[in-house]
């Protein structure tokens, strides 16, 4: 069938591209494979042998090398490597398996769910169908992935097309502690055809390795973009201020009973409130001496050497005297609320008057939006 050609083309043109097989081979001839090794010179008795240069000596092959890989059989392409491009990824040598180690970058995100979602979204972005998947086993098996390349094109006839069809299996394995895992990949089906005719190709181990590494690197590159977006979004969330209210305690109504303790109520989950206090406390002139997130405890010292209190309280007497204190965090009535208590060094609640006096300056710093770095 005659193809439609622009009128500007006055002569027929035929273009030829190198085939995938030819790209593996060195340019030029391979007559060197037929060259025979010449015997050494025979030196007559009584004469000295000439000095031979060893500059161009070819080293002997080791026991694992294949001495048949010469000429057209020698693959000249540089080896591919697994590239840990995404945040929290690195490569561990593990024999012949193709995998990349992935560490969690957000303790609030389930690592296995993140990896599984990233792989599915990557395949969808490339219009690659999923044939089967098993979340419990961490397996994702793709449908046939088809790639076509025009090898010979002529304006007067049909194109000669090289087609590559493959199927892959991804395996997500996360360790029981949930902080790290890995993504492994296997090439499970491979077909090649040229001009509609099936080619009987027996892939070498190196060929399989190249294909799987290339696919894995593409998936990791996609993960890199998504993780960068997630990190930026988290920084934005953490930069936003946290509203804080003071809950005033009531004096004891019965002699001998303890008064209700005043505290601050943060409108944020425990972890976010904890992280914000690491920024706010030093700004208030509270030196963080130690901390224990499991117990929700900050051990702090108050020093009157920053000028903060005098500027904040308009030269009034400091609401908190110099010394050692403890700040205790507890979850509120709901997960998105956190109670903050201020105790002395003996873990006794401070007077309600002191807690309420500090509230104004404390809440201003907690509510302040921060710039993203």
From Swiss-Prot:
GO BP terms, alphabetized: Gram-negative-bacterium-type cell outer membrane assembly; protein insertion into membrane
Keywords, in A-Z order: Cell outer membrane, Lipoprotein, Membrane, Palmitate, Signal
Keyword Lipoprotein: yes
Cleavable signal peptide: 1-16
Lipidated sites in chain (S-diacylglycerol cysteine): 17
Entries under InterPro entries matching the protein: BamC, BamC_C, NlpB/DapX
One GO cellular component term: cell outer membrane
Topology in the lipid bilayer: Lipid-anchor
Protein's UniProt keywords contain DNA repair: no
Subcellular location: Cell outer membrane
Chief location bin: membrane
Lipid attachment points (N-palmitoyl cysteine): 17
Subunit structure: Part of the Bam complex.
Family named by the database record: Belongs to the BamC family.
Biological role: Part of the outer membrane protein assembly complex, which is involved in assembly and insertion of beta-barrel proteins into the outer membrane.
HAMAP family: OM_assembly_BamC
Name by which UniProt lists this protein: Outer membrane protein assembly factor BamC
Species: Shewanella sediminis (strain HAW-EB3)
Species lineage: Bacteria, Pseudomonadati, Pseudomonadota, Gammaproteobacteria, Alteromonadales
Gene: bamC
């Amino acid at each position: 069938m005659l193809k439609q050609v622009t009128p500007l083309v006055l002569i027929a043109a035929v273009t030829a591209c190198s085939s995938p097989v030819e790209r593996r081979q060195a340019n030029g001839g391979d007559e060197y494979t037929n060259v025979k090794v010449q015997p050494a010179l025979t030196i007559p008795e009584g004469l000295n042998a000439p000095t031979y240069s060893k500059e161009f000596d070819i080293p002997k092959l080791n026991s694992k090398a294949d001495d048949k890989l010469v000429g057209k059989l020698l693959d000249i392409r540089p080896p591919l490597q697994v590239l840990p491009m995404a945040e929290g990824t690195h490569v561990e040598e593990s024999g012949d398996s193709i995998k990349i180690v992935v560490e969690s970058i957000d303790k609030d995100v389930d690592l296995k769910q993140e990896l599984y979602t990233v792989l599915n979204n990557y395949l969808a972005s490339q219009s690659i169908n999923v044939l089967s998947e098993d979340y419990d086993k961490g397996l994702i098996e793709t449908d046939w992935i088809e790639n076509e390349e025009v090898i010979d094109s002529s304006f007067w006839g049909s194109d000669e097309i090289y087609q590559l069809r493959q199927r892959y299996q991804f395996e997500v394995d996360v360790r029981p502690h949930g902080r790290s895992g890995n993504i492994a990949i296997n090439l499970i089906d491979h077909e090649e055809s040229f001009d509609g005719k099936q080619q009987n190709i027996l892939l070498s181990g190196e060929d399989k390795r190249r294909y799987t590494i290339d696919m894995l690197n593409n998936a990791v590159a996609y993960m890199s973009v998504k993780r960068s977006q997630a990190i930026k979004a988290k920084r934005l969330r953490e930069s936003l201020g946290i509203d804080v209210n003071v809950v005033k305690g009531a004096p004891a109504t019965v002699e001998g009973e303890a008064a209700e303790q005043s505290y601050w109520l943060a409108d944020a989950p425990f972890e976010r409130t904890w992280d914000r206090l690491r920024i706010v406390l030093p700004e208030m002139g509270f030196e963080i001496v130690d901390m224990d997130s499991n117990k929700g405890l900050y051990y702090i010292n108050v020093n009157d050497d920053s000028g903060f209190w005098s500027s904040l309280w308009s030269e009034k007497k400091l609401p908190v005297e110099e010394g050692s204190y403890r700040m205790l965090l507890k979850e509120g009535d709901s997960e998105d609320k956190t109670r903050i208590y201020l105790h002395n060094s003996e873990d006794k609640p401070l007077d309600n008057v002191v807690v309420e006096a500090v509230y104004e300056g404390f809440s201003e710093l907690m509510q302040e939006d921060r710039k993203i770095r």
